[in-house]
Amino acid sequence: MIAFVLIGLIAATIVIQFVIAPKAAQHLHLRYSYDTQLAEPGETITYTGRLFNNWFFPVLFINFYEYMPEGAAIPGKEESYEAHSLFLLPYREFRHAVSFTLPRRGVYRSGKYLLQTGDFLGFRSWVTSNAISGSITVMPRLCTDEPIIRILGGYIGDISVRRFIIEDPVLTVGYLDYTGREPMKKISWKHSAKAGRLMVRNSDYTVDANAVVVLNMASGSREEKEKSLEIVRTVCERLEREHIPYQFLSNGDVGNLEEGFGKKHMDQLMTKLGRSMLFGHASFDDLIERCIRERKKSRSYFIISAPLSKEERNALSRLQKYSEYEICVLEAEVDQDDAD
């Protein structure tokens, strides 16, 4: 009887050693996700991993390493990876979460994982490694420059006042003879009585307050351009707060965004800002010409740039001639000490 038991154990060991163990890694599947693809600098991001054994045999020895995106910081750890030693029964999973932060604006490619499985006796091991697909975009920080905040606050306040004064976007600019085609509600009975014939109101459909956020990337140092992105975010958050629709224009790799507002609109723009390599591809003069071509009523302009040159200020003066309101210019000045 004991002999049969020993023979059975030896046979089981041989099967595990030479049949099951070499194939174990093929039956381990990793599923993973991040709780966000767009984050603030320093925001806590959670990675969730699920390692699943889809085989009818147990996997008795697993070393499992998960590397977070390069530059990630895991609170309380010096390393940016998690290590686990475990075994998995048939059709069971190992699930866990890792929280980490990313320090600054940019695109962070997802990390990688490494799986090591071994034989029953510890003589051999097999290693599988692969990249974790996807990326996380970190948006710019909010601008904390007091002079910028003060100028911006005053200008946004002026827009709010104008909206209050002209709350109804339909204004009556005169009166015309009734032709029979106008709706009855447009007839002005008061002016009809004065004229002795039917008169209708002639209305001007004005446009509600709207804005263009214009980013100049044709000039400036890297630090000035980084600060310009921070100013763009700050301006757009203030416009969102006031429910003012805004268009975004740039002459760089950030690209453009059609007029709108709301979370989806804001997230699209923040993703563009986060992914920027700070390249400019057209002149400031070309950017201003586009603003002039696409001008519309009740439009406010926010020009964000590194300190403007004389030529750039001349281009800005051309836009001012077409604008109903004073243009808000926010220049990203960087102290040399901060740049160093």
Each language-model region and where it sits:
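Low-complexity, intrinsically disordered regions enriched in charged/polar residues
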Residues: 169, 260-267
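An amphipathic, basic-hydrophobic helix/alpha-beta surface used to engage anionic
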Residues: 12-258
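Von Willebrand factor type A / integrin I
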Residues: 1-29, 46, 263-264, 270-340
